[in-house]
Amino acid sequence: MKKILKTIIIGILTVSIATGCVRFSKEDKETNAPKESSYKVFSEWIGKKGIDSIKISAMKNNIKIYYHDNETVLIQGRYKGNYKYFIENNLLNITAFAEELGDNNLNVYLPNKVYKNISLENRDATSKIFVNVENLIISSNDEVVVEEAEIGNLKIATDNKKVQIIKDTINKAIIETKNNTKIIVDQTKVNSMNLTTESGDIFAKIKGNKQDYQINYSKNTDDSKDKQITAVSGKGKIEISFI
């Protein structure tokens, strides 16, 4: 009898290992992952319509926010760790913490429209935004990229890695970085932009006429024009040009 019971238990364990079944999702949803990988892979559609604001709290996850050709939100991820979301009114709140540094990613695909607010706090991994939003706030200690987006108000605070603003249209931007963090603004149209770094370089290529802008190299400057570019670095190089 003991021998038969032992054979049954071994058989159950063998099937469990072979299927590679893991549990992972907004609370605890079952999904499958290759047995040779410690990463958990998931893909989840958010059925609620009318979401106009996104809040993401993440750690050790490379975050990307895109548009896609669908009227619902899609969340896809690949990492080992915890993930959940909840919706309050029209706010989608996502939490995604990976257990260790690595090739971790969390991608959020959104219906194509202008969003009211996107707030992203991400530690130890990159953050990349490719959607239009009225108010965008990013707090990080790693690389930040905002590319080909229309932004009403942009605020970025980060350490250590570079910030890249590429081919965007922005009304007002405040970008503050610590340490030797480089700020790059490339082919971007902006009305007001304040760039501050402790010791990194600042390179800004602005779409517009130089004569329309007041350019400041210190914070304490009286405004004489509606359009302002302020660039301040404690030790780094500053280059501002117009195209």
Enumerate the language-model features and the residues they cover:
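Intrinsically disordered, low-complexity terminal regions
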Residues: 1-243
